[in-house]
Amino acid sequence: DLHKAIRRQRQMCIRDRYGYDISKQAINVAKENAKLNDVPAIFERSNLFEDVADETFDVIVSNPPYIRSDEIPFLMPEVSEFEPHEALDGKEDGLFFYRKIIQESPDYLTDGGYLLFEIGYDQGWAVSSMMKEAGFEDVCVKKDLARNDRVVCGHKHLCEKRG
């Protein structure tokens, strides 16, 4: 569960934690959650990697918008009425942001660094295939408690710099 994961992360020897989001509201919520859970972190506004300094990261975790544009009108009201549209819309096929992040992330990952995504239940194959095609290694899909594909992860090949 999330609370256990946060507690475990607090105990790990992690030097710096950064959080980026295009939404100011999401950043404020993240700051409050970090404070409540005593997790030191720096949160900044950025559209993907646009405003990320020349940093490299050991791990990048992303939960991008992944719902296809044509599915949004049919979402449950508790989702569509309360979540900002930009937090939901993954464009035409729901994979737009995965493509961008997979393409750009190697420039921001240390050699051997990990990229992890939350995905929609039907996107495991597509996202894992894109990561493999981009040169990520040991790509795997993890299931959630309902046994749906939920996370795709892989690591950057050692000594590879894209550009």
Can you say where each PLM-predicted feature lies in the sequence?
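S-adenosylmethionine
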Residues: 18-162
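Single conserved hydrophobic/aromatic residue that forms the stacking wall/gate
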Residues: 1-10, 14-16
